[in-house]
A protein has these predicted regions:
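Positively charged n-region of N-terminal signal peptides that target proteins for export
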Residues: 1-4
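N-terminal signal peptide c-region/cleavage motif recognized by signal peptidases
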Residues: 13-15
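Extracytoplasmic/periplasmic copper-protein system
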Residues: 19-28, 69-91, 133-159
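N-terminal edge beta-strand
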Residues: 20-46, 57, 148
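Short structured motifs
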Residues: 32-37, 96-101, 112-114
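Asparagine-centered strand-capping/turn motif at beta-strand->loop junctions
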Residues: 51-55
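Short Gly/aromatic-enriched secondary-structure transition segments
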Residues: 61-69
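Extracellular/periplasmic metallocenter environments
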Residues: 100-159
């Protein structure tokens, strides 16, 4: 009986029923992301982003990563990361402005990061970018989190 109660608790706990939404994004040797917008819907409690570097060049020549911050923090986070080098994935260790980030990868490689949408603030603009030196000005896109489900919007009107 004790085992059955423990199993029921695990199966019914929020972590066990969390809806992980998967997003894929491609980066190229031409210093661009192929997707300009990534969108996450209200039913997602966790997001897993997988970055695919579709290029051919190695990480130390044309490496890319995927970094998510508030739009207002992009330049400051990118500039702070330049000074810490490739060994730190061009991300200042402990930078709390970074919501989520992958490691720097070279051509033909993949890297993933998973994070909770609880970190995101409704009504806040988010941007993803590559933090490799000189990349963030052209390698960026919008990250849209729809905190309200389509049912909420239909019942309460759009706001």
């Amino acid at each position: 009986m004790k085992w059955l109660c423990s199993a029921a608790f695990v199966l019914l706990s929020p972590a066990a029923i969390a809806d992980v939404c998967l997003l894929n994004i491609n980066a190229t040797d031409q210093m661009r992301f192929e997707q300009q917008t990534l969108q996450v819907e209200a039913q997602c409690t966790e997001v897993k982003v997988t970055l695919h570097n579709t290029g051919k060049l190695p990480a130390n020549v044309m490496g890319h990563n995927w970094v998510l911050t508030k739009t207002a923090d992009v330049a400051a986070v990118a500039n702070a990361g330049m000074g810490v080098g490739l060994a730190n994935n061009y991300q200042k260790p402990g930078d709390t402005r970074i919501v989520a980030a992958t490691k720097i990868i070279g051509g033909g490689e993949d890297s993933s990061v998973q994070f909770s949408v609880a970190q995101l603030q409704t009504g806040t603009s988010y941007t993803y970018f590559c933090s490799a030196p000189g990349h963030y000005s052209t390698m960026k896109g919008r990250f849209v989190y729809n905190a309200r489900s389509s049912i909420d919007i239909a019942q309460n009107g759009s706001k």
